[in-house]
Amino acid sequence: MADRRNLFFFYGDDKAKLVEKMKPIYRILEENGFTILDHPKNANAIVSVGDDATFLQAVRKTGFREDCLYAGISTKDEISFYCDFHIDHVDTALQEITKNEIEVRKYPTIEVDVDGSTSFHCLNEFSLRSSIIKTFVVDVHVDDLYFETFRGDGLVVSTPTGSTAYNKSLRGAVVDPLIPCFQVSELASLNNNTYRTLGSPFILNHERTLTLKLRPDGNDYPVIGMDNEALSIKQVEKAVVRLSDKQIKTVKLKNNSFWEKVQRTFL
């Protein structure tokens, strides 16, 4: 990151308060040859200040840029999955950066195409959920294979890094982010003598395509989740999901691996 000198800071809640707290850090950065920008266009490093939700917003609002490094500064009690640095210890982090004690990790994203007219990327997960109190019916296809008809509240498709988020609360597997794949998990599936789904999460490799075709039974106005944002589309017939070639480059400490974060968060 030492050669990435043009920084843009993205803030979540309490921006004015956090900017004031970051001013001494700005001075230290400028004294060390960094430039603080007011707009991300010319930045080659984008720093989110907040929590993991802020980091997801920073990536989305700046267009999932592959020519930038992304870094997260936590304002909470401790560092998190996307935030390797803490706002109270940024000066220490700067020393680690100058001593080359950091690594750049590439995180995969998924690409979603809705009805051939709307497409977007997700760093954590894509979710498709019922917007009314009625069973959601979706025909699930893997590549050209009709796999199953899902009935329930919805489906969540997660990346490896997103496997520790919404997916984990659905009893999905935690997946090493070095494995190029994506995972499909169910939301309250309906399983009885008449209707049957796989009943468990399943993982697809990077060459697979997942197609979700909605049955037109009055529930074709779903809630579409893009990480921590909702997309409003009046009518949806199908969504096609693939692992994207687009990867997000993030800055992490050498002594703070993905599995160390998992251990610290859940064990």
From Swiss-Prot:
**Reaction(s) this enzyme catalyzes, per UniProt:** NAD(+) + ATP = ADP + NADP(+) + H(+)
Q: What is its EC number?
A: 2.7.1.23
Tell me which cofactor or cofactors this protein depends on: a divalent metal cation
Q: Please indicate which superkingdom the organism of origin belongs to.
A: Bacteria
Q: Where in the cell does this protein reside?
A: Cytoplasm
Q: From the UniProt record, which GO molecular function terms apply?
A: ATP binding; metal ion binding; NAD binding; NAD+ kinase activity
The UniProt entry, under InterPro entries, shows: ATP-NAD_kinase_N, ATP-NAD_kinase_PpnK-typ_C, NAD/diacylglycerol_kinase_sf, NADK
Q: Which residues form the active site?
A: D52 (proton acceptor)
One cellular component (GO) term of this entry: cytoplasm
Principal localization reads: cytoplasm
Class of this enzyme: transferase
User: Which UniProt keywords are given for this protein, alphabetically ordered?
Assistant: ATP-binding, Cytoplasm, Kinase, NAD, NADP, Nucleotide-binding, Transferase
| Binding sites annotated in the UniProt record for NAD(+) | D52, A53, N124, E125, R151, D153, T164, A165, Y166, N167, K168, S169, A188
SUPFAM superfamilies per record: NAD kinase/diacylglycerol kinase-like
Q: Which Pfam families did the record assign?
A: NAD_kinase_C
Q: What GO biological process term is on the record, naming one?
A: NADP biosynthetic process
Q: Which family does it belong to?
A: Belongs to the NAD kinase family.
Q: What does this protein do?
A: Involved in the regulation of the intracellular balance of NAD and NADP, and is a key enzyme in the biosynthesis of NADP. Catalyzes specifically the phosphorylation on 2'-hydroxyl of the adenosine moiety of NAD to yield NADP.
Cited NCBIfam families: PRK03501.1 (NF002902)
Protein name as annotated? NAD kinase 2
What is the organism of origin for this protein? Bacillus anthracis
Q: Which gene encodes it?
A: nadK2
